[in-house]
Amino acid sequence: MVSLIDTIEAAAEKQKQSQAVVTNTSASSSSCSSSFSSSPPSSSVGSPSPGAPKTNLTASGKPKEKRRNNEKRKEKSRDAARCRRSKETEIFMELSAALPLKTDDVNQLDKASVMRITIAFLKIREMLQFVPSLRDCNDDIKQDIETAEDQQEVKPKLEVGTEDWLNGAEARELLKQTMDGFLLVLSHEGDITYVSENVVEYLGITKIDTLGQQIWEYSHQCDHAEIKEALSLKRELAQKVKDEPQQNSGVSTHHRDLFVRLKCTLTSRGRSINIKSASYKVIHITGHLVVNAKGERLLMAIGRPIPHPSNIEIPLGTSTFLTKHSLDMRFTYVDDKMHDLLGYSPKDLLDTSLFSCQHGADSERLMATFKSVLSKGQGETSRYRFLGKYGGYCWILSQATIVYDKLKPQSVVCVNYVISNLENKHEIYSLAQQTAASEQKEQHHQAAETEKEPEKAADPEIIAQETKETVNTPIHTSELQAKPLQLESEKAEKTIEETKTIATIPPVTATSTADQIKQLPESNPYKQILQAELLIKRENHSPGPRTITAQLLSGSSSGLRPEEKRPKSVTASVLRPSPAPPLTPPPTAVLCKKTPLGVEPNLPPTTTATAAIISSSNQQLQIAQQTQLQNPQQPAQDMSKGFCSLFADDGRGLTMLKEEPDDLSHHLASTNCIQLDEMTPFSDMLVGLMGTCLLPEDINSLDSTTCSTTASGQHYQSPSSSSTSAPSNTSSSNNSYANSPLSPLTPNSTATASNPSHQQQQQHHNQQQQQQQQQQHHPQHHDNSNSSSNIDPLFNYREESNDTSCSQHLHSPSITSKSPEDSSLPSLCSPNSLTQEDDFSFEAFAMRAPYIPIDDDMPLLTETDLMWCPPEDLQTMVPKEIDAIQQQLQQLQQQHHQQYAGNTGYQQQQQQPQLQQQHFSNSLCSSPASTVSSLSPSPVQQHHQQQQAAVFTSDSSELAALLCGSGNGTLSILAGSGVTVAEECNERLQQHQQQQQQTSGNEFRTFQQLQQELQLQEEQQQRQQQQQQQQQQQQQQQLLSLNIECKKEKYDVQMGGSLCHPMEDAFENDYSKDSANLDCWDLIQMQVVDTEPVSPNAASPTPCKVSAIQLLQQQQQLQQQQQQQQNIILNAVPLITIQNNKELMQQQQQQQQQQQQEQLQQPAIKLLNGASIAPVNTKATIRLVESKPPTTTQSRMAKVNLVPQQQQHGNKRHLNSATGAGNPVESKRLKSGTLCLDVQSPQLLQQLIGKDPAQQQTQAAKRAGSERWQLSAESKQQKQQQQQSNSVLKNLLVSGRDDDDSEAMIIDEDNSLVQPIPLGKYGLPLHCHTSTSSVLRDYHNNPLISGTNFQLSPVFGGSDSSGGDGETGSVVSLDDSVPPGLTACDTDASSDSGIDENSLMDGASGSPRKRLSSTSNSTNQAESAPPALDVETPVTQKSVEEEFEGGGSGSNAPSRKTSISFLDSSNPLLHTPAMMDLVNDDYIMGEGGFEFSDNQLEQVLGWPEIA
């Protein structure tokens, strides 16, 4: 910079000096001129002035003159340039005006484009010299007309006497339509000399843009060589052209036929995009290379696009059929029309090569064509000969298209046009024809013999016997139905008559019947062929296009069902290759008098363009299925025992597509059975979300009322009830999603019914009649294997509504779909199918050319996704070890089910409020990760729910299921529907409590006895296994015992003022909000009722009877103090805060007191999820806000340990002991009763909230009069427990029991003197480890943390009295602790409090909802609840509740933000902002719940692909 400035200054000084010199010289020169004016000129010349050599200018100022001249020259040059430009502009304007273009198009052109088009115009005039003149053509036409007139034939309508008509607009339009493409003229250098205007319709590129351009700019680079070859001319040919004398005046032509990929800017929705982002479209260019005598050549061609088979809108004619091939051109789908045209049935061609069915002389051309198809994606064959089955051949032209799956070619679909009749019928061209012809002759003779037999009356006994044989040998009926179009061979009237004739003949054996059935379609093949020829001729001369079923509709329209008479959309047949038979027809329907059933399944399915193929109905399955049908019993039995078919054969429900190709050697339903656990990771919790956000239709469109097979199990009771059971379902409209029988083969296909009696009937039918169902359904579902449950995922790109919307009408047609239009998928561009589903699907999946297949969003809805599958499809995610334990527990439960038959009476009383609350769950089910396993329990669980109706009311509320996270017991939250969601929740909770306490003590007592017996049995089993596995499970026991016991510390121990802020560090790392966390929606239910501790040998029910009366008296005293109780349900992750209604609570508790006084029966702890209370997940503890009235008697010190975990098979998060059963888990939310819990850390609940001791002391006075907690044992345990329980979440992860001297804390002062009854391992105190950092930070060694896999909540190993070794680094290492497919997160201290949920996600998610929402919500809720009770409450409890109600608004939350970030990398959910919002924020239930936007939902669904 400095040097630059210096140079500028120096230049300025020089300029000044030069100016000064100039002025001096001018002055001196003027003086010299004046002084030397008298001197001679020689003197002036001889002695010039000093300045003269530099400027030989006079004093007249010539330097100024020079500058003026320069400026003038510049001005002149600028003027000249302007003039030239104006002249150029004028010339260009004149030139553009002379162009044969529209003025609007011309105005958009720049000069270069005008020159380009002008040159192209000149070349076009040159090109016309290559073509014979129109005048010559007219002369030829006139001569033809004159000769025709001379022959006195009919004069043609078209008069072509002058050129005027051909130059008119009408002729141009007719020419465009005749071309069926666009005209393209290329120079020998590849310049586009001419292109017709309609190129825009095919490629989206305008004529103006392409004229004069080079073809290389628009064609695919791999096709350039082929284009050059087509434009080139071999030397000998060129020389031959020059030598031929006639070429001097004429033209030589050479045919060209090539497939070129050209850029296409049109999208599937008709929009135009930029040329830079255009995709390629295969254009079939056919034309001639025109060469004149000078050697100049042009390629004059017509470009025709090859239609994609999914876009064919017009109905295919009877002489057009579809085939689908693998990449080696083996048939995988065969159109039924081939039987009429060529004599082939699908089984004749499946898995055979196309090249074995064509004439040998055409092999070379076919091979070249299909090589081009495989490389370019589309192609069209030349005319080739396709051999007939019995001899002869037809000429066929095929258009082939590759269908892609994720950019990988999957199959080849061919649209075949038959362009001739069957020629040379009696000539044999292959060995296959010879074999088929000989077989056909034999069958013809046998058919003639059978027709000669006299008709006999049908003997009922023979028919009955025949029925049995038909059931046992279902091959024959399936074979009849596997040939849906074989009866199309004769005319329909003859077909019906012959079918009646044959059906009424009573065959002696079933095999003879089968022979007759086989002979029927095969008989009279020559008549079939003649019929096909007649159809072709009739079609060629018909005024309009004939649909496929034209001949059937005209001949036998009376025999068709109403829906067959209605017009079908184009792709109907592919999605519906054959009308599915009724699910349970009478077995003798086909063979006996019901002839319509024999004819209807065989009616042609009105195929349109691509229907049968696009469904990818694997006809290869049919042959294998017929062999498997001989023994359908074995797989059916397997499926009835905890197995679920992932793909329902009837295509009903939300059956998703498989991404990988089918294993064609097995049947889908029998082999795709995966052993089920009794819960679904994600099933119905998104019903409400989908109903509001995503579904274009009402969610009730999935209802069983739209199907002939309803949700009721009564449908399967008798074969004749297939269509009559729908009106009898009272709850079918309520069970919109849960009860639709997505798979009739699945015995547990229905979720928790809203009507308990209906559910019980359904369960009985599902369990009692599985064998009859399997015998009846198995052959039928094999025939249904062509339905759309097997829809090719590739073809599905055009029908994305099949996946994105949950309407079952958009799937392939069920048996009783509303109408053919509803059942068949709409074509892309048909005018009557532009429905909401089409628009939605196009937005999601834009499909431009066949080279851009499905989006990456396609796998969202496949069966591996846990989000959108039906409940039956996803009960498969828990290891077999857990399932074995659960089966043992189920057997134990079934032993006691008979004792509780009387419980159903009260359940029926609760049906009406349950039915009123069906739609309640839609507002609460907004977490896509919560587990709703209670909606699809196993048969044992359903039966147990029905028997234990009083304890477990089977409510279909997803809220209960979400909160419980249970498999078999739903938390029934009953009441009238409130205005807000919070009120509904409150009412449901209150009625739940009321119902609990109203149920008879006998039921409670017997159930409690069952619990104790099961607990003791499980303890014995555990102890036996613990002796063997003690060494392996010590660490696991440490982890899990703390997991269990740390909850007890919340209630049992005095809240000391010794809480300190270093706890915040323990909370920082524990709660990585993961999919596994979202599974653990645990309902905390505090129970009023407690039972006395029972010794392990107390297996008999008598000890319970003794304590029942005492407990009842104590209960009555307590319930007078519980009228103002606040129940807060806090979910593990989305902290749903539900506020109780005070008045309803008072009324209910009064009713509870009255009933308990009347009945004098023992109330029991109601177990959520059956007896298995939702245990604590490692990633979530539940924060609890409750005022706990004190107990007054010693017998009230009930151990929550007594609650057995007998029914943990329905629970996702088992707190397992050695066998995973029987370990005590406290009921996590007990109804405002006092509990005596073996707990050791008094500050645990406070630590979860984290207030200072000073704050607790200041709040002590506020709560002094409400409750009293025992303070006697606190002082000796506070220091020890403050060290042990640094965080609840650490205790959950690193939970172990050390044998300890610490005593159990008793809540009552009176009970403090009483020693708790030793319960073995249940009575042992809890020992919490103190070193949090080593355990929490060492999350890499935790087997529960396994990357981004999608996992269920971890199942814990048991915590045993054998204690742990005290290692804080011990983690759960059971095999079943990490179920496959889920990701556990590294949780040190997973508290549910608002602290973690708000602060953890604050930095990671761009959540608009910050802490204030949850904090204010919970605070307001706490304020609304009356704080004071009649009972005294210690100071610490008040502080704890205020801490909870504060939602962590204190100093914890900001400080915990800092060390959370390292969790985010391992958490797959943190990558999706919508999911983070869902995980992060509390649901403000009073404000209408949480709602997704569409973008957020897509982001949630777009989380990383799960292995």
UniProtKB/Swiss-Prot annotation:
GO biological process: cellular response to hypoxia; cellular response to insulin stimulus; insulin receptor signaling pathway; negative regulation of cell growth; oogenesis; positive regulation of gene expression; positive regulation of glycolytic process; positive regulation of macroautophagy
Composition bias, Pro residues: 578-588
UniProt KW Kinase keyword: no
Disulfide-linked positions: none
Regions annotated as coiled coil: 880-908, 982-1054, 1110-1162
Compositional bias of kind Polar residues: 548-559, 706-717, 803-818, 1413-1423
Residue ranges constituting the PAC domain according to the UniProt record: 381-422
Domain of life: Eukaryota
Biased composition (Low complexity): 26-49, 718-745, 754-777, 823-832, 907-918, 926-951
One cellular component (GO) term of this entry: cytosol
Induction of synthesis: By hypoxia.
Location(s), subcellular: Cytoplasm; Nucleus
Alphabetically ordered keywords of this record: Activator, Coiled coil, Cytoplasm, DNA-binding, Nucleus, Repeat, Transcription, Transcription regulation
Gene Ontology molecular function, alphabetical: DNA-binding transcription activator activity, RNA polymerase II-specific; DNA-binding transcription factor activity, RNA polymerase II-specific; protein dimerization activity; RNA polymerase II transcription regulatory region sequence-specific DNA binding
Region (ODD): 692-863
Region of interest: Disordered: 1-85, 433-459, 541-588, 706-832, 900-951, 1204-1228, 1251-1287, 1356-1460
Pfam families: bHLH_HIF1A (PF23171), PAS (PF00989), PAS_3 (PF08447)
Domain bHLH per the UniProt entry, residue ranges: 72-125
Keyword rRNA-binding: no
Domain PAS: 167-240, 307-377
Tissues expressed in: Ubiquitously expressed in the embryo.
Compositionally biased intervals (Basic and acidic residues): 72-85, 439-459
Comment block on domains: The oxygen-dependent degradation (ODD) domain is required for cytoplasmic localization in normoxia.
Known role: Functions as a transcriptional regulator of the adaptive response to hypoxia. Binds to core DNA sequence 5'-[AG]CGTG-3' within the hypoxia response element (HRE) of target gene promoters.
Quaternary structure (record): Efficient DNA binding requires dimerization with another bHLH protein. Interacts with Vhl.
Stated name of the protein: Protein similar
Gene: sima
